Regions:
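Long, charge-rich intrinsically disordered scaffolds of nucleic-acid metabolism proteins
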Residues: 1-104
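Phosphate-backbone recognition surface of nucleic-acid-processing proteins
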Residues: 103, 109, 114-190, 194, ...
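Hydrophobic (often cysteine-bearing) scaffold residues that line and stabilize catalytic clefts
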Residues: 41, 76, 158, 162, ...
Length: 243
């Protein structure tokens, strides 16, 4: 028998049996929706400008109309950048966490905006370990017995946009941040691959980010947040998988 009444009962029974796994729906606020709009606009303008610049480099003589289009996109991109920064600084809902996030080395204002949108201002995700998995910063093992083994790899179903932003930040840290540059040099001497090093730095960055949000405290170089033991153990485990 299949009726609306029977279906409703089955759904209710299923929900009751699995109530420990229920995640309440968390709708996007107006601030998050506006930030998402300007972030998408920023990315669209950036990609369009990049395409035209690449096109111009393949020409001996750049047409005036093409250069004009590049200049217009550059100006639009500047205005969009300004709008995103204003939202992060002045919006009552976003400003506090945005300030904390941007204090972490490797987290730019664009990365901050993207993570605020993706986590819905750190309400959709509150745990660095889970978010690292969501963004493809956690290697997964694939083995069975003694005959099946693949090198640990990150999930292809991850949020690649956030992953790419974290990668950009990690590469920048390896060049400009003394602590991370020394860390990268040490790992290279140990024979670690560049991908492994970048992934470890992405993980470190995310754990620092969620720590400052959790503790409501600006990141300080010489301050070590008291991470929960399970978070610390998981980070060590993640690093060990890639090493």
């Amino acid at each position: 028998e299949k009726t609306d009444k029977v279906d409703a009962r089955m759904i209710a029974e299923y929900a009751f049996r699995h109530q420990d796994k229920i995640k309440p729906y968390n709708p996007q606020t107006e601030s998050i929706q506006e930030l998402r709009f300007w972030l998408k606009t920023h990315d669209a303008l950036k990609e369009s400008r990049k395409s035209l610049i690449n096109l111009s480099r393949s020409m001996k003589h750049v047409p005036r109309t093409l250069q004009k289009s590049i200049d217009e996109l550059t100006e639009q991109l500047k205005r969009t950048d300004k709008k995103i920064k204003e939202l992060l600084k002045e919006d009552q809902e976003l400003a506090s966490n945005a300030k904390l996030a941007m204090s972490v080395p490797g987290i730019s204002y664009v990365t901050t905006a993207a993570i605020l949108v993706d986590t819905r201002n750190f309400t959709r995700f509150t745990d660095a370990r889970k978010y690292a998995n969501h963004t493809g910063c956690v290697p997964h093992k694939h083995s069975s017995g003694t005959s099946v083994y693949r090198r640990p790899h990150v999930s292809k179903a991850s949020n690649r946009y956030i992953n790419s932003l974290l990668t950009e930040g990690s590469v920048s840290l390896m060049t400009h941040n003394k602590e991370m540059r020394e860390y990268a040099d040490k790992k290279r001497r140990e024979g670690k691959s560049n991908g492994c090093i970048i992934n470890n730095i992405r993980n470190k960055t995310l754990h620092r980010l969620f720590a400052v949000i959790r503790n409501n405290r600006i990141f300080e170089k010489n301050y070590r947040c008291e991470l929960k033991k399970e978070h610390h153990d998981v980070l060590i485990h993640h690093n060990a998988l890639f090493e």
